[in-house]
Amino acid sequence: MGIKGLTALMRDNAPGAIKEQKFESYLDRRVAIDASMHIYQFMMVVGRQGEQQLTNEAGEVTSHLQGMLNRTCRMLEAGIKPIYVFDGKPPVMKGGELAKRKDKREEAEAALKAAREAGNQEEVEKLSKRTVRVSKQHSQEVMKLASLLGVPVFEAPCEAEASCAAMCKAGLVWAVATEDMDTLTFAAPRLARNLMAPKSQDKPVLEFDYDKVLAGLGLTPEQFIDMCILCGCDYCDTIRGIGPKTALKLIKEHGSIEKILEEIDTEKYPPPQDWDFAGARELFKNPEVMDTTGIALSWKAPNEEGLIDFLVKEKQFNEERVRAVCAKVKKARQGKASQNRLESFFGPPTIISSTIGKRKVEEKKGKNGKAGLANKKSKGVSGFRRSKN
């Protein structure tokens, strides 16, 4: 879920913390990627037509593999160095959020059945996306794919985004690539959004600088965590009626959730029953993450025959296109090996600015990119069948 309303809050109050970057400007950058979140997105949208997903001859869904293959190839061709991190066990405090998601999925499944019976194709397409489940097998298949492509792979002990943030803080990577803003709540120095967006969307990468976020909002790291909890996070409920703007105002006035509870009208703004905001705060401050000491990152040439065995023989991908992907990646490795980062070659980044009542781009306006990932079909390796969810 991330943090509700955090992006808009930063645009309005800390615009200097956000830069629009070109995808190509990440040449030779190491980037930790929350793979589990992107698998879910690929399962929802890649190759989908109505409620039909891409499958192999055995009826196994392959949307996640096509999506990850396309995006990984694009990054490697651009000289970007991805590291994929996968979720481990969920924290106990996330149990409530996971239960809510399960309930919503079951509601969507019931509504989907009714929409099918009514012949409402628009509702069928919308609801089928809400029933998507990412299994352990899906994650393991993407791990195998990434390894065969020569990309470093890690399984976090708990939340992937927390371990990604730890890698960034340790200086192992330049940024964390994810769409979930709570990566900043884990104090990742840089967060990159849209890095995994398809090329067809032509979206600029939005890079968020953690230190500039704190400076722009006028908060300490501890206050930023409390504000995010008030906005709404995955680990606990929040106070109904208090949105992001009010959350920022209250934290700046009182300094902590404890002080806020002493001052606000709790009849008008009743806190949740048994509200464990302190537990959520501790999870953000001291999450369970992988040990970053002694990690040696390396990117290898793709294992072409291994990819043929896995993607072509097992998953029925098109062999010619898989070999073409391998050729592109190998060529890119040879071409980028001697290149150094020259940020001036790409020009200065665009700084996001804010004015009262509207938002604008200070140096130049990037394309709006209104069509989200769910509105575009990804082009790439073909050779699939379609099956209903």
UniProtKB/Swiss-Prot annotation:
Protein keywords: DNA damage, DNA repair, DNA replication, Endonuclease, Exonuclease, Hydrolase, Magnesium, Metal-binding, Mitochondrion, Nuclease, Nucleus, Phosphoprotein
Post-translational modifications reported in the UniProt record: Phosphorylated. Phosphorylation upon DNA damage induces relocalization to the nuclear plasma.
SUPFAM superfamilies documented for this protein: 5' to 3' exonuclease, C-terminal subdomain (SSF47807), PIN domain-like (SSF88723)
Localization per record: Nucleus, Nucleolus; Nucleus, Nucleoplasm; Mitochondrion
Region listing for N-domain, in residue ranges: 1-105
Pfam family, one: XPG_I
Example GO BP: base-excision repair
Superkingdom classification of source: Eukaryota
InterPro entries: 5-3_exonuclease, 5-3_exonuclease_C_sf, Flap_endonuc, HhH2, PIN-like_dom_sf, XPG-I_dom, XPG/Rad2, XPG_CS
Annotated DNA binding sites: R71, E159, G232, D234
Disulphide bond pairs: none
Region (Disordered): 356-389
Annotated binding of Mg(2+) 1, by residue: D34, D87, E159, E161
Cofactor-binding details, from the entry: Binds 2 magnesium ions per subunit. They probably participate in the reaction catalyzed by the enzyme. May bind an additional third magnesium ion after substrate binding.
Cofactor needs: Mg(2+)
Family under the similarity heading: Belongs to the XPG/RAD2 endonuclease family. FEN1 subfamily.
Name the record gives this protein: Flap endonuclease 1
Organism: Ostreococcus lucimarinus (strain CCE9901)
